[in-house]
Amino acid sequence: MATEVKAIAKYVRTSPQKVRRILDQIRGKSYKEAVMLLSVMPYKACSIILKIVDSAAANAQVTKGFNKNKLIISKTFVDKGPTLKRFRPRAQGRGYKILKPTCHITVQVQDQSL
């Protein structure tokens, strides 16, 4: 049985759809390859996901003694968080509803040698 270590970021102020398109590209890749991909992608969510991947690698190194260079991204998923609701004043006393989505991002890594 492979030991997996995870890192979770909750209430991230971005839409789950925008995060999911990035997570689909790094799932199954090695740690080094995922970091390289995230550093060159032009999306805002890449910097957030890069921090989570680094945190998962650090968790694996500290808690299980794994080598960062031998880690693979085994599972990644994003869940919808609560939506922040705001109102924008409009003409004639109206207000338009502005929805600001949040999400919870989970990244799991495991040692390649196991």
Swiss-Prot record:
Its main location: plastid. SUPFAM superfamilies: Ribosomal protein L22. The keyword Heme does not apply. GO terms for molecular function: rRNA binding; structural constituent of ribosome. Gene3D superfamilies: Ribosomal protein L22/L17. It is found in: Plastid, Cyanelle. NCBIfam families: rplV_bact. Belongs to the universal ribosomal protein uL22 family. GO terms for cellular component: cyanelle; large ribosomal subunit. One of its GO terms (biological process) is translation. This is Large ribosomal subunit protein uL22c. This protein binds specifically to 23S rRNA. The globular domain of the protein is located near the polypeptide exit tunnel on the outside of the subunit, while an extended beta-hairpin is found that lines the wall of the exit tunnel in the center of the 70S ribosome. Keywords: Cyanelle, Plastid, Ribonucleoprotein, Ribosomal protein, RNA-binding, rRNA-binding. It holds the Pfam family Ribosomal_L22. Part of the 50S ribosomal subunit. HAMAP family: Ribosomal_uL22_B (MF_01331_B). It comes from the Eukaryota.
